[in-house]
Swiss-Prot record:
Family under the similarity heading: Belongs to the universal ribosomal protein uS14 family.
Gene: rpsN
Species for this entry: Prochlorococcus marinus subsp. pastoris (strain CCMP1986 / NIES-2087 / MED4)
PANTHER family assigned to the protein according to its UniProt record, in alphabetical order: 30S RIBOSOMAL PROTEIN S14 (PTHR19836), SMALL RIBOSOMAL SUBUNIT PROTEIN US14M (PTHR19836:SF19)
UniProt KW keywords: Ribonucleoprotein, Ribosomal protein, RNA-binding, rRNA-binding
This protein's name: Small ribosomal subunit protein uS14
Entry-linked Gene3D superfamilies: 1.10.287.1480
Superkingdom classification of source: Bacteria
Any GO MF annotation of the entry: rRNA binding
Length: 100
């Protein structure tokens, strides 16, 4: 189980990403459309002025059951341990143990 503070930090990051998503996208569109280097520099400074945690790359996928950051399957949002446990218990519809 991950520390509660780490899980809370990730929740805070997700809120910041959601809050600044439109502003960040509009600034990035302006930046890509600008031809003048000075104009690009000015827009880049505005982007840098946004909170660091509002960048989507800083959000880490975590298991929703345990909060673990590693070995998380995107399709389920579960870490490998929880995926195995829940699949064996039949809690994941459509997931069956393979045999050949």
């Amino acid at each position: 189980m991950a520390k509660k503070s780490m899980i809370a930090r990730e929740v805070k990051r997700k809120k910041l990403v959601k809050k600044y998503a439109t502003k960040r996208k509009s600034l990035l569109d302006e930046f890509n459309a600008a031809k003048d280097p000075m104009e690009r520099l000015e827009i880049h400074r505005k982007i840098q002025g946004l909170p660091r945690n509002s960048a989507p790359t800083r959000v880490r996928n975590r298991c929703w059951a345990t909060g673990k950051p590693r070995g998380v399957y995107r399709d389920f949002g579960l870490c490998r341990n929880q995926l195995r446990l829940r699949a064996h218990n039949g809690e994941l519809p459509g997931v069956v143990k393979s045999s050949w």
